[in-house]
Structures are given as structure tokens and as C-alpha cells.
Amino acid sequence: MFSEYKSTKKAGPKPAQKVEQVYEYAVWWLNQRGYSVSKLKEKLTRKTDNPEWIASVIEKLLDQGYLSDQRFAETFVQSRCRLYGPKVLTQKLKLQGVGTTDIEHALCTINDSDTDELISRVIAKYSGKKSIRDITMRLKSEGIDDTRIQSVLSSNIDTEHESQLATRIINKHAKKMGRSGLLQKLRSEGISQDTIDELFSEESKDDVIEDDQHKALEQLNKKYKTSLTDFAEKKKATAFLVRKGFSFSEANYAIEHHLEDL
């Protein structure tokens, strides 16, 4: 009997018998941390299903200054503005049920030093891993002003940042990809043309062609273990190499010398 009683007992706080108990319950939660009006109402529905009591308690707390969406929004923003940009903060506050006017007022309390710290944190996180373009897009998605982004970027990132990222990309893909594919990959990752030109400035054109021809041949030999005898097979082989980032001339060289030294 006892076990059956335990399993059916309603979880949550003891239901309020009078409005004063709802008020005390609300004050207890506000002493734990700040709440928006909307979220505190949700808490109070656990104590009572009487909407008039809830409305009365909320009104009393607002009149006493214990409850304020404006103050909640300001505190929320100040505690998180070095972690999130305005767009994300706005989304989070809307989920708390805070209105647009209070959100806009709270966002106005963010100063430039807070924003600069957020930008610097994102730069440090992605330095050498993401291009300047991608970092800029990431910050813009947070709702940070482009002028502020560029100001901090110019003092925190130099060409060495892109060179490190480009070198990582090259080292990862160079053995399996031709020069045209590498260039396309670098550009798609937001690496500037100046950085690309600098990295490849000391290579001779003939050496590049020869190296890419041999890489294309190596990839083809791994993929196709038997001779390519008809046009359809050669067409598929060419498409395979082009997808790998090799040019048509490099693909033709590989097909011509396929399995030659094996």
C-alpha cells in the first residue's frame, strides 16, 4: 500500500492554500536568482492553479520593485555580453519572455570594451583555424557592428594568421590534390590571393606541373587496379581526377601512363 501511495503522489511544492503562500514562494525563487515576469509566472503555476492569485502576486512584486523585466534584462546582458553578441542575447532574452523595449534598453548598456573583449575571444579561439573572412562572418552573425569588428581585427590579426591557416590546409590536402584543386580549396576557405601568391611564390611552374602529374598518376593507380581500355572507363577516370582537384591535362597524363611502372 505504501509503495503504491508513493508512486502516485504528485511531485512539486505543496499547493498554496492562500495567496500569501504564493507570494512567499515567489520571493523564495527571486532570492535564488533573477527572473523575468514570464518565467516567474511559470514557477508560480507549480504552487497554484489560481490565475488571480498569480496575477496579484506578480503585480505586488512589480510595485515593490522586487520584479522588473528591465532590471532582469540589464543584469542578463551585463553578465553575458563578453560571451555573446547582441543578436544571440536578444534571442535568449526573448526566450525568457522579455519584451522588445526592455531588450533594446539592456543592449544599450554594452560598452565598446565589452564588445572588444568578445571579438578578441573569438579571434583567439579561431586563430590559425579559420580565415579572417570566416571569423568576420562569425562575429557578424552575433550582431556585432562591422566597423567594430574590423577595428579589433586590424590590431589582433596579421598576415601570419592566414599563412598558418593556409599552410595547414595545404599540408592536409597536398598529397591527394592537384594545384588547381588546392587553389580552389584555399579560396573557398577565405584565404586572400596575396597570401596564396606568397606561399607559392618560390615554386617553379615546371616543378609544379611534374609534381601534380605524378600525384594524379598515383591517385589513379590506387583507384584503378586494371587497365583502362575503353572510352567510358577513361571518362570516369578523368572525372575522378578532376574531382580530386587535378586539371584535365594532368588527368590525361595519368591515364596515358596508368599502371606503366607497376
Swiss-Prot record:
Q: Does the keyword Cytoplasm apply?
A: yes
> Which InterPro entries does the UniProt record give?
RecX_HTH_2nd (IPR053924), RecX_HTH_3rd (IPR053925), Regulatory_RecX (IPR003783), WH-like_DNA-bd_sf (IPR036388)
Q: Which Pfam families match?
A: RecX_HTH2, RecX_HTH3
Instruction: Choose any GO biological process term that the UniProt entry carries and state it.
Output: regulation of DNA repair
Compartment annotation: Cytoplasm
Which top-rank group of organisms is this from? Bacteria
Q: Which residues cross the membrane?
A: none
Keyword set, alphabetical order: Cytoplasm
Q: What is its main location?
A: cytoplasm
One GO cellular component term of this record is: cytoplasm
Q: Known HAMAP family for this protein?
A: RecX
The entry assigns this protein to a family as follows: Belongs to the RecX family.
Its annotated function is as follows: Modulates RecA activity.
What name does this protein carry? Regulatory protein RecX
